[in-house]
Amino acid sequence: MGYIIKTDDSARLRLGIQSRLYEQSSVDLISRAGTLRGRKILEVGCGSGAMTLHLARAAGPQGTVTAIDNSPAQLDASRELVTENGFENVNFFEGDINCLDHLDNLYDLVYCRMVLHHVADADHAIREMVRSVCPDGYLLCEEPVIHDGSFCFPPSEAIDEFIRILRSCFSVNGRDYNIAFRMESVIRNLGLQIEHSRLHHPLLNSRQDKLLYAMSLSDLAPQMIKNGIVDPSSASELHEKLVHLSNSETTMTWARMHSVLARKSNGTERHYSKA
Ligand SMILES: C[S@@+](CC[C@H](N)C(=O)[O-])C[C@H]1O[C@@H](n2cnc3c(N)ncnc32)[C@H](O)[C@@H]1O
């Protein structure tokens, strides 16, 4: 089963807003993952490359970033961005997070943002990433929280309805929308030491930021309609309500990201042998 969200230009616009909202916190967490200059970094599900740039900068010219995604279109966008910005230390591969054993190296940092909730077996994906971390290296996973509907003040029925159908869509497609909160215990049970755990709630201040929910609905609507979760006219009615909400100056909305930075000590190996 493939990626259930569109990966075209409109989806990239939405990803651009999300990246901007989370960028500062993500860069701060990367800076906590030891000295990365001259080191090997693996980014899984690099998308259109927003974080690939920061990772390439952190590794420096003597270090390398291996960026993997299972979408050729996303890899093309990411490659273009990295080249435009003059980085020559990034290697791109088309590949699946569930199958990282073809990689020859172990990495000082394995980084993965907003990918695990798209994967059919997120626990297996985490095991694969843990196996790719070198002794004393780090794993940094960041996942958006779509656990409940509390993303708005005053409360909005449209946001609640959107979160309800979003969760249905992930469930019907066998995705774990609770992985943002589960991943910390999964990582700990694989023997890694949790060094930092953060729940970040950036506010969506401008009209364009507040459009995030309407944009997400547009990107997911074809899959939701295909799965019978919503009919086309209800989807377009809900879309209108979400656009309307983004125009309101008195409504506050926000997004959430849970991030876990974990370290693998030398004794970790016995816990994560392949299942
Ligand atoms: C929401 S985007 C996040 C992109 C990027 N990590 C960021 O934070 O901007 C999710 C990315 O994961 C990729 N992806 C989804 N399932 C994957 C899988 N099984 N293996 C590798 N990449 C996957 C998608 O193609 C998409 O580029």
Predicted regions and their residues:
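Class I SAM-dependent methyltransferase Rossmann-like catalytic core
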Residues: G2-Y22
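Conserved alpha-helix/loop element of class I SAM-dependent methyltransferases that forms part
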Residues: R20-K40, H54
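Class I SAM-dependent methyltransferase SAM/SAH-binding core
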Residues: L42, S48-L100
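A short acidic, Gly/Pro-enriched loop at the edge of an enzyme's catalytic core
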Residues: D101-L109
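A short SAM/SAH-binding and catalytic strip from SAM-dependent methyltransferases
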Residues: D108-A122
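A short glycine-rich, Lys/Arg-flanked "PGG" loop and its adjoining helix->strand segment in the class I
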Residues: D123-Y138
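Conserved catalytic/acceptor-binding region of the Class I
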Residues: L140-Q208, Q223
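Conserved Class I S-adenosyl-L-methionine
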Residues: N178, E195-A275
